[in-house]
């Protein structure tokens, strides 16, 4: 993974929120880090209130905003001290948390803050970046994933066991951060979820993210995960009637119309041609995969679904996965 940082572009942004916008967009440009609407970023800023008094604010990405295109209006300013106090509570329901976040914003027209706003607030750095990097989740989703992370990064990452995003996760991270942090700490990994990096400059937080993910990608490459020679094929064309029939069957199972598009990217064909494809497709994927075979030309389906209770859901054309199918809104054959 390569850094997209450009000094000329960066110089166009003159303040901390501007730098937050810039590096957020850099993260959003790489779909192996975040998909549309995924991930979140924040910056801590001191601003004057209407009485001319300084107040500490957390500008955090608004829920649903896309990092690739986010701009200043996409960040919600929330009172930092209140967020930190919330992390000390024993319990906080989701409706209560949303109410506390919204009622402590300093801009009523701002979007609803990310559900991970409290987590961002508890990290003692000005800039915090969070992604769902493919390489990171690929490793953590394998057997002994936690140990693999330790082998790769040593004591440079704080490791948090999986828990659903929200108040409980923020509270756990707030406690574990101070238990595990050391002079070598560069980030925090949430197993089966993603990676946090942080620093007191936007550039350093971003560069930390890129470097740590690059290490994960290098580890995967060293395991020969993608070193497969694509067999020569005379004709890779997929009959449009086959596509239509496949879409119809999947839509029937899903109980709603589904959209299916075809791509023949080399890395996808290479993966689809592996002899142990079905085994690979059912473990460690950061996105959901289903296998279909058509004569001599296997293909695979990436399904954009929800992650539910630490289970990466996979849609297959069988009756037993009907509930999973209903969670899907888009099906893409890539």
Region locations from a protein language model:
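Glycine-rich flexible loops
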Residues: 1-334
């Amino acid at each position: 993974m390569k850094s997209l940082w450009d000094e000329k572009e960066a110089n166009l942004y003159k303040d901390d929120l501007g730098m937050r916008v810039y590096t957020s967009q850099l993260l959003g440009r790489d779909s192996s880090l975040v998909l549309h609407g995924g991930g979140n970023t924040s910056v801590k800023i001191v601003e004057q209130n209407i009485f001319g008094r300084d107040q500490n604010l957390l500008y955090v990405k608004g829920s649903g905003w896309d990092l690739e295109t986010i701009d200043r209006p996409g960040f919600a300013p929330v009172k930092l001290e209140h967020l930190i106090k919330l992390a000390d509570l024993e319990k906080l329901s989701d409706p209560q948390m949303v109410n506390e976040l919204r009622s402590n914003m300093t801009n009523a027209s701002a979007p609803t803050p990310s559900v991970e706003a409290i987590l961002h607030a508890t990290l003692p750095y000005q800039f915090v970046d969070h992604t769902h990097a493919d390489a990171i989740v690929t490793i953590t989703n394998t057997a002994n994933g936690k140990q693999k992370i330790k082998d790769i990064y040593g004591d440079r990452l704080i490791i948090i066991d999986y828990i659903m995003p929200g108040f409980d996760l923020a509270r756990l991270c707030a406690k574990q951060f101070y238990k595990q942090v050391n002079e070598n700490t560069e980030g925090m990994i949430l197993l089966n979820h993603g990676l946090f990096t942080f620093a007191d400059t936007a550039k350093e937080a971003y560069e930390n993210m890129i470097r740590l993910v690059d290490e994960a990608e290098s580890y995967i490459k060293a395991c020969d995960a993608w070193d497969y020679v694509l067999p020569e094929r005379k004709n890779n064309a997929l009959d449009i009637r086959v596509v239509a029939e496949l879409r119809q069957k999947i839509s029937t199972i899903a109980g709603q119309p589904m959209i299916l598009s075809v791509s023949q990217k080399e890395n996808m064909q290479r993966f689809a041609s592996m002899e142990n494809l079905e085994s690979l497709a059912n473990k460690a994927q950061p996105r959901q995969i289903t296998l279909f075979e058509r004569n001599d030309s296997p293909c695979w389906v990436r399904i954009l679904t929800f992650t539910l209770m630490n289970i990466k859901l996979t849609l297959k054309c069988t009756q037993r996965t009907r509930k999973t199918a209903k969670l899907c809104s888009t099906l893409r054959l890539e």
